[in-house]
């Protein structure tokens, strides 16, 4: 059978149903191209237009599709290997970025793809044919044998990228690459669930990443991103909920070599559900509980790590531990909490299913006899053909997990249970070559497969857990049967009486997050995961250093001198991989410290707790965990002085440090200050019984001073009590007696520092008998060379390997901390913050949230009643006033615009009585508003009316220039008019050089009076020469380009990831945002490439850099005069070289009426505000370093009012009462003010400013507010309008406050923060702070009007509206010209009421 993708049909005579058989035949061969789902135009596929960044029209789905926990009715297909539930932004905003994206994304191969010039095609359709749905169902049931066993899709959506190529820069003489990719995505859904299939046929991936367009000549390639993202932006960029499958080129290469379905190249995922779905869940072949593996996972799965590890040349895999750090055991397919990169590993080549499984996979797997056995080591070369039998008396535990995981985690052997024989093993299993080898099912819960009934155990006994003393956990309702437990058997089915018994289901929260919970017949126990140790309730990483903090108090009789001290500090540091323990106690009085020198048990406790373990032994922490009581009684000889030491451990603090308090009471012999104590190496025997450890021994020590050497001794009796778990089988207990060997004991008191120090090196093992000395493995005596944060793995003889402990990464000889918060390897859930610690991390809930019982999930603290929502407020009716909630039961009332009063009572404002209309207009008052209409014989918007009369002079016989001149002169007679009056020569023709009389701008015109593009000059400069243009010349290289070329030559043409290369734009100017190599460490630069202080950011938040060089002029250019706006309220926004006009209908955006108000070529307009009294718009220009204004009258032209003393003017605010303007200058770090005509200029502030940006004014109350986005200490400040009473208003929980506005009606100060992604408001005094919206993209400026906020956004390059009441994003406007928008302001038809 063959598949003809071009024709879109099967080659006759084979029917489509045979495709199912072909795909699911019993083989492990790679997916072939003809095994893709059928596609082609004959199947109803639509074709995406050719291009580099194309997007399909919305595909309206017949039935909404579930993605994560939401439903969507539309899908969009993009050129760049991606599907979304909403239209895509420009590709530059996502195609070169890592996950998460800012929009919902389903990405089978996200890269910069280009189908221009017929390089491949992209097809898509919705399909309901039975053949396609049946094939999709088979795939899903294969990968999800439990939850997907009854999945019957009703609809499918298919997208196929066929022979598509990567975007390539056009180079002279270079032929396009012949590397083309083919892949397919299928979304299958029913009314409850959605599954995704990603299919990569053999040889279908010929390129594995693409170069960013901004990389210029740097040979940088970004690997394709594969995965899913819900698209919600949280406080930190990398905390949005997402699932990522790839992160390196090698992992992309292996997409068609590995699988989680059993066929290399085929992948399945559960991506949406009506039930709770924490994150995308990958498929698991043979995921039935009866065939799950029999040992706990040592760490979380990681697709990316497994794909990366599976190289084309070797099966060798080195575990870097980044995937191991903080996850508890989970099943394949379980999605972890939080927003982190989900780590799951799969391989298709070896993954058996039980022959008696009810959900046996239809996909083939090698027989268990073909499975290799691996020796436990740091790294192993895996040979699938190797067979290795276990020693006699051992059972080989075959790990029925995904074999790609075997690349990371080696096989494990455990002793066979006493008395176990072949007759008592699970029936139906294949005998592995007549060896004493058996595979056992896992009975742990499968979180990703909820509500699955569990079959009873039939003649089944579980082996010991791979780690001594651990038994695998079970599904709900099943208990582990130990050989010493009492059970009843009937018909070979075990039954139990579980009445009044604590179970893991209700008590799992008592276990450490690094432990699993196991149910036994009498209760539950906690057991630490592999690579951790402890008592299950407290677990710490193996090999990692540990710290102890505590207090020491004492009441001693030193000789005949009483000495007392209280709560002095104790700190201990333990290098656990070689058994060293260091203890320091500060501020103990000198006589007591000197006398306690021989009392080594004070610090010796930590040596026993974290001693090096010899095989078959356990140190103290493995027994006690972090809660115990250590009682010591020391009796000195010959004086019989007796002292008692009590050390109480109180658990682990949030940084995983052991907390311990010590109390010392009794009598100790006096030791003179000039004596030191020497203690020889010694052994102690510790006896274990139930929850008590005891030890008694005698010890001698020497007191030395010069030639004096005195030998004394004491007897030590120790008793350590703790709470052991009594439910586990007793045969799992530690040996009754263990020997602690202490070497290199050391005690010293430093009188200068006031610190008493102890140091010991410890090993614990079985009781030794005298025998001939043998070579000791360095792992047991601490002589290895592993890093202090690495585990030492003993090998044969004196061989060993080193492996970094969880929370660290490296080669084992050198390890560095893993920042789980930055890399995403953490379990902090939504509404929580991850805080990195050395070797670990902790989760903290955000404000307003608290931890749930699992200590990872943060749940909302129930808010107090909101009077504004429940209707219990006392404000005026909704149409007259609005209720403002201030937290708790506090609220205030504010009259709506057009009404006046207390807010509790509001009355209509008669605007007509205030003469708001033009003198030639009629005013009509309405409740809450008014309107103006020009009288007959006049035209205009009512606020300005002009006469309809024609100029008195006859127009007959006038040339165009003369006519326009006469008309302009007539209009100029009206007060306030700034229209240009054309200049004509003696013959009535246009003078080639035209200049505006009031503004000073000059330009050339043609014979029809039309401006010649590009000839306009600003005031004060040399007028243009109105003649033919000069011949073009080649542009010389700029400073940026020369610097870039020099560095690239220095780096040998290919810089490393950590080497800086300047980024230049097409004209050679420095790009305002510069970053260090591939890192997220970025900063802003000026036009000369100099870093702007205070702009350097940490990874996660890019600084908001504003360009200082205007883009080139695009011809033809429009005239620099005002196109009059429509009547009513509208928004004005700055967009680089133009000011845009966006009308409002109420509070809704009238997007179809939006247009350009004023074109200002050669400018970069940033700040903008409006003077409501004279109807003039003001703006700052960072390219021209000026502040200008223009009237909103027809034909009015810009007027520059401040031309000097500016470097980077950004924010601008107008006080229409006092006729004053205020602005920020981030180049000079100043805040200034001046009259609206530029006079009376004054610097208000020039200190304690780093990056001042937004500024706003409350003219009625006389307050000024501004933001400073200094990356080290962002803040919002306020002062009076005269610069008095300056103070910080907000400096907590803000990141990059770009936008600031004061609402004169609600009296609220509000700001938009691009760092925290929040829109927040507060009262003018800084109280009553509340969040309006916490999922913004990248806001720049914000303004308030009526019941909405409007902000410009740099991610969407548009204007976004946000409801004040609900906080929801209600609408957006994206201008046709896609570039960054800066300032925004609202233009009212009247001024807000009030007086100075």
From Swiss-Prot:
Single Gene Ontology MF annotation: calcium ion binding
Pfam families documented for this protein: EGF_CA (PF07645), G2F (PF07474), Ldl_recept_b (PF00058), NIDO (PF06119), Thyroglobulin_1 (PF00086)
Compositional bias per record (Polar residues), positions renumbered to this chain: 346-355, 379-388
Chain positions of LDL-receptor class B repeats: 1175-1218, 1219-1261, 1262-1306, 1307-1348
Compositional bias segments (type: Pro residues): 1020-1033
Occurrences of domain EGF-like (ranges): 500-540, 775-816, 817-859, 864-907, 908-944
Domain Nidogen G2 beta-barrel: 544-774
Signal peptide coordinates: 1-30
Keyword list, A-Z: Basement membrane, Calcium, Cell adhesion, Disulfide bond, EGF-like domain, Extracellular matrix, Glycoprotein, Methylation, Proteoglycan, Repeat, Secreted, Signal
Localization, UniProt: Secreted, Extracellular space, Extracellular matrix, Basement membrane
Disulfide bonds listed in the record: 504-517, 511-526, 528-539, 779-792, 786-802, 804-815, 821-834, 828-843, 845-858, 868-883, 875-893, 895-906, 912-923, 917-932, 961-984, 995-1002, 1004-1026, 1040-1064, 1075-1082, 1084-1105
Function of the molecule: Cell adhesion glycoprotein. Might be involved in osteoblast differentiation. It probably has a role in cell-extracellular matrix interactions.
Name of this protein: Nidogen-2
Organism: Rattus norvegicus
